[in-house]
């Protein structure tokens, strides 16, 4: 059995003015080496849960642990091991592919030879090598998706949160992403993929 890397105990979140909780008390353990699906209709709380796991939103009750770190109390430690790709891929459309990668590398303090090797690996992995000078805003939906994934992987996370990564992209691009993500899981990464 794989090592458990995310554990949730009674995790809840409510928003003011809402009759029902955004996330009802949730208990689960998620293991590395798998792609775990977080499936539900729009408004079910998938993005809210992802944001709590990424330390971007504080839970109202219960607790979460990601690789032993509390997402709020240990945000610096969590940032070093977690990659989060939001629904819109988190890209700067007025920057080129390479400028987006450089920005994310700067944010993750990836420098020098490690940066060069990481970029070479990610550009090959995503097949974006020929497009490094293209503005992100001029990429197709599938290419934006791949760039978003590459930017998320710059820091070599152990946990990858993908919030609705297949929305707005063609079936071939979704299949390619699915294959890339399964390869990462096969290498021991924990992947949580939300979808409707």
Task: Describe each PLM feature range.
Residues 6, 13-196:
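ABC transporter nucleotide-binding domains
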């Amino acid at each position: 059995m794989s090592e458990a890397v995310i554990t949730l105990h009674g995790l809840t979140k409510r928003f003011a003015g809402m009759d029902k909780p955004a996330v009802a008390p949730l208990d689960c353990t998620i293991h590395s080496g798998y792609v775990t699906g977080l499936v539900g209709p729009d408004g079910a709380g998938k993005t809210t849960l992802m944001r709590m796991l990424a330390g971007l939103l504080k839970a109202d009750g219960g607790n979460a642990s990601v690789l032993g770190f509390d997402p709020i109390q240990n945000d610096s430690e969590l940032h070093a091991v977690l990659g989060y790709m939001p629904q819109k891929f988190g890209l700067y459309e007025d920057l080129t592919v390479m400028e987006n990668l450089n920005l994310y590398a700067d944010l993750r303090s990836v420098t020098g030879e490690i940066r060069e090797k990481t970029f070479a690996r990610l550009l090959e992995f995503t097949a974006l090598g020929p497009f490094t000078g293209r503005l992100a805003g001029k990429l197709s939906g599938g290419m934006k998706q791949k760039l978003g994934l590459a930017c998320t992987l710059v820091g070599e996370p152990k946990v990858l949160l993908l919030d609705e990564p297949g929305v707005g992209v063609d079936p071939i691009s979704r299949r390619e992403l699915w294959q890339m993500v399964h390869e990462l899981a096969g290498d021991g990464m924990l992947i949580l993929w939300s979808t409707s």
